[in-house]
Amino acid sequence: MSNLFDSDSPTNLAEYSVSELSGSIKRTIETAFDQVRVRGEISGYRGPHSSGHAYFALKDDRARIDAVIWKGTFSRLKFRPEEGMEVIATGKVTTFPGSSKYQIVIETLEPAGAGALMALIEERKRRLGAEGLFDAARKKRLPFMPHVIGVVTSPTGAVIRDILHRISDRFPVHVLVWPVKVQGEGSGEEVANAIRGFNALEPASAISRPDVLIVARGGGSLEDLWSFNDEIVVRAAAESRIPLISAVGHETDWTLIDYAADVRAPTPTGAAEMAVPVKAELEAQAAALAARLQGCMNRQMDQRRQSVRSLMRAFPSLDQLLALPRRRFDEAAAGLGRGLELNTINKRRGFERVIAHLRPDLLSGRISERRQMLNERMVRAERMVERLIDRSASRVERAEAILASLPARLKAQTDRSRERLGNLTRHADTAIRHQLTRARAELSAQDRVLQSLSYKNVLRRGYAVIRDEDNRPVSQAAALSAGMGIAIEFADGRIGAMTTEGGTPPGGAKKRSTKPAEPTKQGSLF
């Protein structure tokens, strides 16, 4: 009976292994929550992982659930998730049996109403505005007549066609288009990189640097225009050194890039109108200004002619002014003939005097003098050359003599150096031997001092050193107790001993008798 009550009672509960239970829970949850919509705030979002997947959590004021967006789904999202954004996520709940954790795999993601996005925009606008990115002092004036216009927009669509058509109608200039995505994943980075890329161009590079930038996109919902609210786009627009016109959406659509841009255009077409003036209007203004200038010039010319006429009436006539000069000219012309005749006579007389000095005998004498002078100079030159040759020969002979005596001089110098080296070597050997002798003597003296101070000498005089069990010297009896093992060191070695109480040798050893043993009365068998 006792065995019956002690045995385990049977049960109807099924027995699971841990993996079976985890798998059953996984199937139950995934079946019950195959498609769910969850409203919550994004928490812990740090952007997509290097694999392309995005991991974060959805939370409210009382709970949180892990969430994941796979790479393929992430690329199809209409807007980018951001930290603190309230969203509605659609997907399925799944678990990990290995760790008993569950999460929602998001298939679609949308903001929880426009109010959530507007609240996020207002918070970002307040924060960036506090940094001064929207200050009016940062705004730059647009150039009146740009030579090159840079456009950041989608290469396909009506926006770029409208901008090019409007610029062509008003004032044809060179347009550079930087194609980008204007919505979806990665569009914000492309727009920011395009703005920075235009600013990085050098003015004298092969691709001309634009004088003004237009960032444009057509109309759309708040989610479609969300890329132009990205912080990276706003900062790139605020940092642009090139004047920037934002033309995103329609006139009623406002994005954060509109506050950071230098000028906001209501539409892309309006941006083109702001960028360039109307050529026909400029031509009309130029024609009107030219007409006004011509009228001013005509009036000035008339006034100057009238002034000249007035001045001419005040001056005497030309005949009166030239009467005296004409008379002087006639008198000078009359005296010119006589002057020429006198000048000719004087020149002829001078020529005759020169000819008188150029007789053949005088020329022969001068030639003889010059020849004699030349001969004397040649003789002096020959003597000078001979002296130079003699001095050079003497120098050569002295150099040869020096070279001939050089081996003997080198040999004598070498012998003297060898003899000096031998003397130095002998002196060095002698000095080293003296140093070694003094060092040995000092070492012997120090060794004798060391031996005299060694405790071994004391032991040779009959003393001993007592050491305890730790081989430490014992200098007082109080340091020992009965029953301790000690070592006694003599001059010729060590022995072991045991301490006793009161200094009595162990075993009550008796003093040996020095008396000879008395012979016994009992006889010996031997």
Swiss-Prot record:
GO cellular component: cytoplasm; exodeoxyribonuclease VII complex
EC number: 3.1.11.6
Pfam entry (one): tRNA_anti_2
UniProt catalytic activity: Exonucleolytic cleavage in either 5'- to 3'- or 3'- to 5'-direction to yield nucleoside 5'-phosphates
Annotated region (Disordered), positions in chain: 497-526
Subcellular compartments: Cytoplasm
Biological processes, Gene Ontology terms: DNA catabolic process
Source taxon at top rank: Bacteria
InterPro entries: Exonuc_VII_L (IPR003753), Exonuc_VII_lsu_C (IPR020579), OB-fold_nuc-bd_dom (IPR025824)
Main localization of the protein described in the UniProt heading: cytoplasm
Recorded GO MF terms: exodeoxyribonuclease VII activity; nucleic acid binding
Keywords: Cytoplasm, Exonuclease, Hydrolase, Nuclease
NCBIfam families assigned to the protein according to its UniProt record, in alphabetical order: xseA
Complex formation: Heterooligomer composed of large and small subunits.
Function according to Swiss-Prot or TrEMBL: Bidirectionally degrades single-stranded DNA into large acid-insoluble oligonucleotides, which are then degraded further into small acid-soluble oligonucleotides.
Family recorded in the similarity comment: Belongs to the XseA family.
Protein name, per record: Exodeoxyribonuclease 7 large subunit
Organism per entry: Rhizobium etli (strain ATCC 51251 / DSM 11541 / JCM 21823 / NBRC 15573 / CFN 42)
Gene label: xseA
